[in-house]
Curated annotation (Swiss-Prot):
Keywords assigned by UniProt, alphabetized: DNA damage, DNA repair
Keyword DNA repair: yes
Purpose: This protein is involved in the repair of mismatches in DNA. It is required for dam-dependent methyl-directed DNA mismatch repair. May act as a 'molecular matchmaker', a protein that promotes the formation of a stable complex between two or more DNA-binding proteins in an ATP-dependent manner without itself being part of a final effector complex.
Pfam families: DNA_mis_repair (PF01119), HATPase_c_3 (PF13589), MutL_C (PF08676)
UniProt similarity note: Belongs to the DNA mismatch repair MutL/HexB family.
GO cellular component: mismatch repair complex
SMART domains (alphabetical): DNA_mis_repair, MutL_C
Gene name of the encoded protein: mutL
CDD domains per record: HATPase_MutL-MLH-PMS-like, MutL_Trans
Gene Ontology molecular function: ATP binding; ATP hydrolysis activity; ATP-dependent DNA damage sensor activity; mismatched DNA binding
One of the protein's GO biological processes: mismatch repair
Name of the protein this chain belongs to: DNA mismatch repair protein MutL
Amino acid sequence: MNRINILNADTANKIAAGEVVERPSSVVKELVENSLDAGAKNITIEIQNGGESLIKIIDDGSGVHPEDVEKAFNPHATSKIKDTYDIFSINTLGFRGEALPSIASIARVDFKSKTEDFDMGKELIISGGEKESLTDCSMNRGTQIEVRDLFFNVPARKKFLKTTARESALINDLVNRISLANPDVSFKLFNNNKKILNTYGNGKLIDVIRTIYGKSTAENLIYFEEHKDTASVYGFIGNDTLARASRNNQSLFVNKRYVKNRSLTVAVENAFRSFNVTGKFPFFVLFIDTYPELIDVNIHPTKSEIKFKDERFIFKVVFDAVHSAMREYVKDTFTLPEEEEKKFEALKEEVIQESLDKEISTLEKLKENINYKVSEDKKKEEIYSYNPSKDYEAKTEVNIPVDFLSKENQDESFSINNSLENNEFKEVSAKREISYDPILIKNELKDKVSESTSESLERSDYKCNKNEYGNSIEEIIYREAKFPKLRVIGQFNKTYILAEYDSTLYLIDQHAAHEKILFEKYSSDIAKKKVEIQPLMIPLVVTLPTEDYLYYDENKEIFEKAGFKISDFGDNSIRIEEVPYFLDKLNPTELITSMINNLKKMGTGETVEVKYNKIASMSCRAAVKANDVLSILEMENLIEDLRYINDPFHCPHGRPTIIKFTSYELDKKFKRIT
């Protein structure tokens, strides 16, 4: 039977450190929060090797009393609270008294501090929780703490650290968030002696946002605020141009504490999606100020999660604030003056009348274009006394030649048999019988469709001629066709290609099919180092947020081998000179940003091949889109290319590209068989 042991101080501190100090960014968080609690207005953070070698914090706060310097490193020693009652009304960021002893137990610490009332400060040096010296020192008011060799005595913890670039990015992201919460404090961040961040501390939140995220972000923000008796909500939300595929650019602060709360994040996103259907996540910086008694921050070791006394109420306040601001923003964009609304109504009536006149004119032309035979003069007389309005009332269907089909009616089928029976027509020339079959009418539609097709294909870069691809499609893993050669019937809703083979109907999603073709070709080109590149006419300079730049810098070789020629341009800026050939018509800035976001979500443990595949998946942006009109030849070539790729049945995102219905299945749906 194991007996109960009392752990020694060193072991207990290391256990506590495991909860409080997960990685270098945890150290930065605890120390910067101490500086803010001390009333500092200027805080400098220096790190080396992702914070593993050195973390140095300098502030101009109130400092620590000389007699309290050594006491501050004792477990549960704090100046923030005195008894249990204070726990339920916390006004400071820190309060447990765990940070300093936890950090000192797993690192080498040099702590200096001086208050306004003393001429000299105190310097305390601790290594692995053991005091080495306590001496007087000369310094200005404030505190300076150096943390070196983090986890030097807990080597097992080092295995869980990510790369230096990743740890640096986490620290940068943390300091960015803290800067947003404290616009009246000037923050400086140095990484390996290079200045990464410098905020002005002028109290203007928009200036901090501009410094961190750039000018374009600051210019596309919508301010919101809502005030209730027990809570105030305010902040900025980005318009749809700032929406991204991840939540990386979302910041939530409660009483200036950066926290994560799924419910409140959903409140903002729901309000945003009421006016935008982008399917992406909005940019926002949200502040909630409430009474300390109404929240509990003592539910998580890192205080990154909090509990509200009435979370439903806070949810509603947040939703209403954002929803109201978005509604006004959209309203300002689309509202018409009263005079213009009246003009619009008048114009609408005019268009309706004009449309009716055209329909009547079309019916008149119908009599001249349909070849028919009549055996009795009486029937001929009935035809020439034809009353269009009467037939409208009778809802008689009339077969109209393609030449006279209006754009609105091109998707309808016109059958003349039943309609002409009602008018007692005896014969109709088979040559003039009309059915809306794209194969039969493609020559008539050719001129009308070609202009729209050319425009859409120029945008998508899809080539009709297979030779434009060279032999690349044939080189992708297998030449064996994966499904039979199909006969194209037409295009439905400008999105789906209809084709048939052996009494089976095939529906192909043109966008999903084309993006999979591009994906496999691009992946193959990357693997063979044969990516065709397209120089930009004018090289584009892009300034990235610091975190994004660090990810780019870590994956430079990946971008280069993927067909991008990018050079550094100073101060987190890059110069895009060349891109893969089929991406040259896309926005390079959005493309690079999306690729970096994809790499962010992957982490650093993925292989180079996985990263290449993630970048290759961006080829979908160059694929033909829904609502792109394709000619029969273009659809045939698209399907033919799809037949010979490795996996033609799913797009890079896992959605199906092609589905089929047998004649038997269709007969069952129409109850022709049981």
